[in-house]
């Protein structure tokens, strides 16, 4: 994740390396002239490893069952440690920031099928920071820590996406979600 990147992440809650697009050239052994397209890969929901601000994180109360469902269905556990990842609704404000910070050419959406059985779900379209509406990613970690998500609700599709191979085969509700993400970012 971009928010763990040493340069563009939510310092001090970052890793010691570059996990953004620039890391492919500086740490991946790929010459910068060999990069002609930048793909941004993201999940239909948000996750975070370790500490740090996470405005859309599911709470331990009313959302604990939803968190556990997404964690189990999406297999959101650390590969080496087995620790459960922090999960929450897709943060479109953070995704738009990631696109800008990394000059993303195209997005690749994964884990859409995790939502197959839900009646509805939400995505963050802005924040409220100390009572003020904020539609951009905050420059300060303190503002991000104080951010409350402004959520938009989407209808679920209640059908398996397992056999879907083409965009047009997606249920209308899934296409609506994808279209909203495309327009927002």
Where are each of the predicted segments found?
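Non-transmembrane, aqueous-exposed alpha-helical and coiled segments at domain scale
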Residues: 1-185
